[in-house]
Amino acid sequence: MGIPYVVVNGSQSLVNINFTAYGTESDPGPMPVPANAPIEGDPNPGNGDRHVLVIDNGNCFLYELFGASSNSDGTWNAGSAAVWDLQSDEQRPWTWTSADAAGLPIFPGLIRYDEVAAGKIQHAIRFTLPQSQAAMVPPASHWAGNSSSSPVPMGMRLRLKANFDVTPYSANLQVILNALKKYGMIMADNGSAMYLSGTPDNRWDNNDLHNLSQIQASAFEVVQMNPIYTAGNVPQGAPPAISSFTASAMTVSAGTAVTLNWQSSGASYYVVSPQVGAVRGTSVSVTPTQTTTYTLNATNQYGRSTATVT
């Protein structure tokens, strides 16, 4: 039960991601995904969402995969994948998915046992509903409409009403309920009705958690949604402008370090592939072992621009 995650340090090996569905809306990698990273639904993930979440605590990046499966050569397959810079407040490009249908990061919305045990959850909580319309409200950047009659856009935030009595519930559930009063919960995917998401932990009392299902939707209120974006009014703007992408040397012996430099404006984050992955700043050192074409991916809320150097 729940969506698992793994924490790695900055020395975790980078591996390639092979995209099977939404590659054009994904970050290209490589990504530091361990061969034994837990998949949502393990040990029998079946045909579920198969999310894989990786926190790089050395470089402060979050990597999330949807529809993930590992390969014997260490690479991974994924329907989609996104990297999140934990040192900045970024968003996916408008109309782009992430590893979640709303285009949001998954991990920040999960309920973790350690938070509950500490007595305080300080963030909104991820939840699902069976149906949604083809619309989104910030912070969502993507929709997955499956109903023309549903009034619910991706990114909708519900808040537990202030007068809801939490005292009949256990101390742990009161922590969750108080967070729902203060921060609310954000619609992030189509799924089970009013389903809150958390991380697996043997310390959870699942019987106690099931008591949350007694709470009716009428106990919540919708936080004002403005603006609501549909296909007719998606925000428009310019993707990043890359003015240069160069290498310090164009011909070197195998294994010799080369510095890639770039100048760009308007980018929220960068990914250099192959070999590098997500990176901050305007330069990075690489050590090619053969003739290699490097691609700079510069992304903001309006799209992605690329440049190459060989």
Give short role names for the model-derived ranges:
Residues 1-237:
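Short, surface-exposed polybasic-aromatic patches that bind anionic ligands, especially phosphate groups
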Residues 250-256:
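Short, solvent-exposed loop/linker segments at the N-terminal edge
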Residues 277-295, 301-302:
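Solvent-exposed segments in extracellular or luminal domains encompassing
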Residues 305-310:
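C-terminal edge beta-strand
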